Curated annotation (Swiss-Prot):
Localisation: Cytoplasm
One GO-annotated biological process of the protein: lysyl-tRNA aminoacylation
Superkingdom per UniProt: Bacteria
Essential cofactor(s): Mg(2+)
Entry-linked Gene3D superfamilies: Bira Bifunctional Protein, Domain 2, Nucleic acid-binding proteins
PANTHER family: LYSINE--TRNA LIGASE, CHLOROPLASTIC_MITOCHONDRIAL, LYSYL-TRNA SYNTHETASE
Protein name: Lysine--tRNA ligase
Keyword terms of this UniProt record: Aminoacyl-tRNA synthetase, ATP-binding, Cytoplasm, Ligase, Magnesium, Metal-binding, Nucleotide-binding, Protein biosynthesis
Reaction catalysis annotation: tRNA(Lys) + L-lysine + ATP = L-lysyl-tRNA(Lys) + AMP + diphosphate
Cellular compartments per GO CC: cytosol
Length: 491
């Protein structure tokens, strides 16, 4: 097995320096000072005059990574900013051994007094210096960054060090998740955690990852949704719940899909589909406001998107019929099969009328939905957890939110009739036996929970990765996931 590729000259020089340091007692020491907050230091002292620091001694200490050096001036990256340290020639000569073995990329700790340079830059004049960590590899160029995209994702730690835009994206992602929590917490929702390992496949239509639970001698699934356990909590009297967590779907990855992703699902007792659509729309507006984004003229994927106006709402079968110039309502299954063949739509053995209507929607309508649009009224065959429409039982009280041709949210008027739910699960088993690998299984424990009585409720799921793509204006999901899944690297 290959342990390490051949070292280049720079790597060998650094290892030789580390050997010298170790011989003289260096052992990757712990930090020794209480560190100051550099953001606060900048805010408090950056506008002070040079004379202020001659009259007032302000001592600070901090640690960070050495990223540039110009004579006695050392630029240290710490606490998400760059701070300049002045280390006199006399101090360097006094500590000649350490500085002779110092390289860019090393992590150092300094303390000393603040002063202003001739150009007015706030700096620290160092009187204590420690090497904390020796870097054995040179950092990528600060200007060019990591040019190979695959290497950028594999070595995200380097990308974040040298690419300020990447670092900004992930700090913003964290803020987005925090704001989502604020939005729901302020409305009395309770954040909960439900199991990642599930004995029964359900809550969505997706291929699962399967693992083996040794102590139970049983296969388990990594969850494909959090829906069913959250709805059990509605039965338990928790009227407003949400969960932010990882979801796993054993499917392909592309610019908008990753097999492991983060979602939020929220459920509200006594809310109908209209209320949940309004709630989702309000969440988007809340995020735009708190992130200081322009909702009326938002640029994404070379398109102008208007989030200020009320989101459009269209019935699925009506808009699909219109854009296809084909009456889906009056067509029978044979008509739809014939139309599918003409349009190059693949027909699976388990397809019924509703499956084909959905495929036509995906082909003819979905790519055209640029501004935020709710599509309402999905076929019952593809919506086993949503209430059927009392005025048209072949369709459901379900909606999806589309932006820029992509799905961003999926919401239901939740099915709470246990008899109907069991029947839907049984229909899913028939589909599975006919080859639908994404069909759900019968979750008898969930059905039994419904038998105790679940209040009428609405619920919604939103992919946080795709939402972050939108709000940070990134067109690849890999840009908003710290360590995205990649194909194995070839030797």
């Amino acid at each position: 097995m290959k342990i390490m590729s051949k070292l280049n000259d720079q790597q060998q020089f650094r290892r030789d320096k580390l050997k010298n340091l170790v011989k003289n007692g260096f052992n990757f020491p712990s930090s020794t000072f209480e560190h100051d907050n550099l953001v606060e230091i900048n805010e408090k002292f950056s506008q002070k005059s040079k004379e202020f620091f001659l009259e007032n001694q302000v001592k600070i200490a901090f640690a960070g990574r050495l990223i540039r050096q110009r004579g006695p001036f050392f630029i240290i990256f710490s606490q998400n900013l760059q701070f300049q340290a002045y280390i006199s020639k006399e101090f360097q000569k006094k500590n000649e051994f350490i500085f002779a073995n110092l390289d860019l990329g090393d992590i150092i700790e300094v303390s000393g007094y603040l002063f202003k340079t001739q150009t007015g830059q706030l700096s620290i004049k160092v009187n204590n210096f420690s090497l904390l960590t020796k870097s054995l590899h040179p950092l990528p160029d600060q200007y060019y960054g990591i040019e190979n995209p695959d290497e950028k994702y594999r070595k995200r730690y380097l990308d974040l060090l040298v690419n300020s835009e990447s670092a900004k994206t992930f700090r913003l992602r964290s803020k987005i998740i925090s704001l989502i929590r604020t939005f729901f917490d302020s409305q009395g929702f309770l954040e909960v955690d439900t199991p990642v390992l599930q004995p029964v496949l359900g809550g969505a239509s997706a291929k699962p990852f399967i693992t083996y639970y040794n102590s139970l001698s049983q296969n388990f699934y990594l969850r494909i949704a959090t829906e069913l356990p959250l709805k059990k909590l509605l039965v338990a009297g928790f009227d407003r719940v949400y969960e932010i967590g990882k979801i796993f779907r054993n499917e392909g990855f592309d610019s908008t899909h990753n097999p492991e992703f983060t979602s939020i699902e929220f459920y509200q007792a006594y809310a109908n589909l209209e209320k949940i659509m309004d709630q989702t729309e309000n969440l988007f507006r809340f995020l735009f406001e708190k992130l200081n984004l322009d909702p009326a003229n938002f640029d994404f994927s070379n398109k102008k998107i208007n989030f200020l106006e009320k989101f459009a709402r269209y019935d699925m079968i009506e808009i699909t019929s219109k854009l296809m110039n084909f009456d889906l309502k009056s067509a029978n299954f044979a008509d739809l099969v014939e139309k599918a063949k003409k349009e190059g739509v693949k027909i699976e053995p388990f397809f019924k009328k509703g499956h084909l209507i959905n495929k036509f929607f995906e082909k003819f309508v979905e790519p055209t939905l640029i501004n935020p649009t709710f599509i309402i009224g999905h076929p019952i065959e593809i919506s086993p957890l949503a209430k059927s429409n009392p005025n048209n039982p072949n369709f459901t009280l379900r909606a999806e939110l589309f932006i820029c041709g992509k799905e961003f949210a999926n919401m239901f008027d939740e099915l709470n009739d246990p008899i109907d739910q069991l029947s839907r699960f049984q229909a899913q088993i028939i589909e599975k036996n006919q080859g639908n690998q994404e069909a759900s299984e019968i979750d008898n424990e969930f059905v039994q929970a419904l038998e105790y009585g679940m209040p009428p409720a609405g619920g919604c799921g939103i992919g946080i990765d795709r939402l972050t793509m939108l709000l940070t204006k990134n067109e690849s999901i890999r840009e908003v996931i710290l360590f995205p899944q990649l194909k194995p690297k070839k030797d």
